[in-house]
A protein has these predicted regions:
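Flexible "arm" and connector segments at domain edges
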Residues: 1-243
Length: 243
């Protein structure tokens, strides 16, 4: 059995390796951290290749991947703002024997997109007016909506999320040299990407990136906001068996 709290704890593990603050009591954030948390959720819902894009392309794997990513960054925001007290622990595992995945009709899928948009705006509004209750309500509702979307679609969200977590933990490098080499590798790789938007995004991410030691690993961080970036040994999650 896998629960929302189990998923939250996996994100906390990732954040602690990245030396990102994890708060267990309600905590407001400075503009830099607040803006990062807002942009991370916004990107996973509306960004290129993310949820809305995957719905429009009828991509079950893309939709599931986006739901996992939205959950990951939302749990991260819950940890950052210390809203763990508002996160209910409920089961996300479904019976694989009876599981049959399906693409939702567009109007049904867009109902979830509207929900997620409304809850994201609620979170954002809470950040802007400094209201902890509004922040936590928006975040936990995003979690609930993602879990519901996956369940109705017949996706194995528990298995997929574990795969995404393993993938995220592979971002880290074993030595400082590996991390520095990874920055150069990703900058060179960016020049070969066929998607112009992804090419620009990757170049922007790794230009000015820096390396930070955390315990026994080295973390590559984006220069403008400290977001953890992928090392050269990062592997993409294979979610096809869960979708």
């Amino acid at each position: 059995m896998s629960t929302t709290l189990d998923q939250y704890k996996q994100v906390v593990e990732f954040m602690e390796v990245c030396n990102q603050p994890v708060n267990t009591t309600r905590t407001f954030q400075t503009s830099k951290i607040a803006n990062l948390r807002i942009e991370l959720i916004k990107e996973e819902i509306f960004g290129t290749g993310e949820l809305v894009d995957s719905i429009n392309k009828d991509s079950k794997v893309g939709i599931l991947d986006a739901l996992c990513d939205i959950l990951y960054v939302t749990y991260g925001a819950i940890a950052t703002y210390g809203c763990i007290d508002a996160l209910g622990e409920y089961e996300i595992t479904i019976n694989n024997e009876n599981r049959k995945s399906q693409l939702l009709y567009k109007h049904n899928a867009l109902t979830y997109v509207k929900e997620l948009t409304d809850y994201f705006e609620q979170f954002k509004r809470g950040v802007e007016i400094g209201d902890s209750r509004t922040i936590s309500d928006g975040l936990v509702r995003i979690v609930s909506s993602c879990v519901s979307f996956a369940r109705v679609s017949g996706f194995d969200l528990a298995g997929a999320y574990d795969e995404v977590h393993r993938s995220n933990m592979s971002k880290f490098c074993k030595t400082e040299k590996d991390a520095l080499d990874s920055i150069e590798f990703r900058l060179t790789e960016a020049e070969t990407l066929p998607n112009p938007a992804k090419r620009v995004e990757q170049k922007d991410n790794y230009t000015g990136a820096y390396v930070e030691k955390s315990g026994s690993v080295y973390v590559i961080k984006r220069g403008k906001d400290g977001k953890g970036l992928k090392g050269k040994d990062f592997f993409e999650p294979d979610l096809s068996k869960y979708a």
